[in-house]
Amino acid sequence: MKGENINNIHLVLKKMLWTSLIVFIFLIGRNILIPGVDAKQLARFLNNQYLLQIVNGTTGGDLSRMSLFALGLGPWMSATILWRVLTLIKRFDLKKIPIERTFLFKIAIAIIIGFIQSIAIISNIDINPKISIFAQTQFGAMATISLIMVSGAVFLVWLSNMNEILGIGGPTVLILASMIINWPTNVSLYILENVRSSLDINSVILMLVIMISIVFLVLLTVVVQRAQRQIPIRRILVNNNFYQQSYLPIQINPAGGMPLMYSMTLLVLPQYILQAVHYWLPNNVLVENGLDNIAITKPLGVTAYIIILFALSIGFAFININPDQIAEDLQQNSDYIDNVEPGDATREYITEIVFRLSFVGALYMSLIAGFPLYFGIIDKQYTQYALTAGSIIILVNLVINIIDQMKALLTKNNYSALFFE
């Protein structure tokens, strides 16, 4: 047992070293700036783009300086959701496609989305048309910068896959690193703005309220993430001394923080598309109205965000907890739930529980990170606060997931004598 513990510690240390190397490469990429971009104009463009700023931070991107990894994992995350939707359409029969080809299809979709996003961003800023010998015109410069941004996004997908194989946390580590880097900067900017605009008693009280709210939200997120519905399981092959420890745990919020990341990414995608179209059709009234109405500070944009968030909260619950697989595993191991027949009845029972819990989780997400955005329609400052609440939930969930993965690795192969010989 002692030798197994040492091996587990060595495994965790090895994976942590790989993750450290991958994060180091990620940080280098964030500091490789794309030439020919007007940084001041980019900052002005991002100034009122609250959702874009938050999305950029929660996908590992860095638009503030237009670096190699400016797009982050946003295109890949959007492609993953779109592919998941396509697999639900039975006519396409995409579930039978091999994993290798599925990955290539998702990469292709991510590249298309990446080009749309890069063009949408570049079209709002001035660029130097002579950034290289291959780009002597405005169009050539845009194409070159777009290619660099998309290449960085694809490399980031590969980097996250390497961390999934060799390190700890997969792509979540890169997103976590990005959020940790961005947070001190955003907090310091907020404090400086208040100091410059005369730091009075009201500003001090507001900052104290914000700090207390952040602490409360962190504690609430931890409690919700750790809360479980435990379904007792009878295990025929397990020693009766351990019977009371046999249960199927299902989180109260089965989807975790993933719906927040993906809902933000999906909501910003139509904005990118309209921004790109607006570049080619600058005087089109429909495009301008669309851009104005789907903003996160408008009723339509907020409502769309809440609907997407609610739907993804239920969808991700069934991705994280597969009732079909659980029912099959229980039946194969001769285990069963009290008063529930093995097989289809068990699957339906677990499906019902997951749906109920996911509905509760969806309401929780909507109330904490969705409905407060309606206050931003009155005052845009509240939009920033509401989106920050969502990013806190994401941050806490990412940290919890990484800690759980490390615990699982440390206790790997540590089994008690549960089974009869």
Curated annotation (Swiss-Prot):
Protein's membrane topology: Multi-pass membrane protein
Q: Where in the cell is it found?
A: Cell membrane
- One Pfam family named in its UniProt record: SecY
Principal localization reads membrane
Per the record, the GO terms for biological process are:
intracellular protein transmembrane transport; protein targeting
Cystines in this chain: none
Listed transmembrane segments: 17-37, 69-89, 102-122, 139-159, 165-185, 204-224, 254-274, 299-319, 358-378, 383-403
Query: What is this protein for, i.e. what is its function?
Result: Part of the accessory SecA2/SecY2 system specifically required for export of possible cell wall proteins. The central subunit of a protein translocation channel.
Among NCBIfam families, the record links this protein to: acc_sec_Y2, PRK12417.1
- What name has this protein been given in UniProt? Accessory Sec system protein translocase subunit SecY2
